[in-house]
Amino acid sequence: MDREELLRTITTSHRELAQLAERISDDRLRDPAMGDWKGKDVLAHLAWWHDQSVLVIEGLRAGRQPYDETDPANTTDGFNERVHREHLDDRPDVTRVAFNQSFERLQAAIRPLTDDDLFGADRWPWLGGEALVEMLLWDTSRHYAAHLEHLAPLAQNART
């Protein structure tokens, strides 16, 4: 895989989920999708992870630590809980737009990266020996696959 293939992979995955989201009415996006999360909350969550990836890329490229990993609030669960709380009142149309616009920002952040930036396991010490591409795949295509099962039923079953 190189940068162009990465961009094709995540863009294809994003397009598929964005098309699914377009088939879900705003009313259905207000329905439960995952525990106490509504469909719109899942889209807001995915958008936040896109933007988080952008912040990590920007921090790494600037030579700074993107965030303090030792802070107990900066865990995956901590981030997810905070994002859910902060976006509870977002309208479905807002989360749909955020999902798409945040992905555009992520694509723009990836484009100037070299293959070494993306695939070099030792390129960014802050990532603890993991290549940046792994984080990007988990924050995009792999993440979409994990939430597809939560959103797909909202597109299939019309509210009566």
Where would I find each of the regions flagged by the language model?
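Alpha-helical structural elements of signaling/regulatory helical domains
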Residues: 2, 48, 52, 90-91, ...
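Short, contiguous alpha-helical
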Residues: 8, 29-78, 118-160
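Structural signal for well-ordered, non-membrane alpha-helices
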Residues: 14-22, 50-58, 100-114, 145-148, ...
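Acidic/histidine-rich alpha-helical segments that form the ligand environment
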Residues: 76-119
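Extreme N-terminal tail/first-helix region
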Residues: 1-16
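A broad, low-specificity signal for short, low-complexity segments enriched in glycine/proline
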Residues: 3-6, 68-69, 107-110
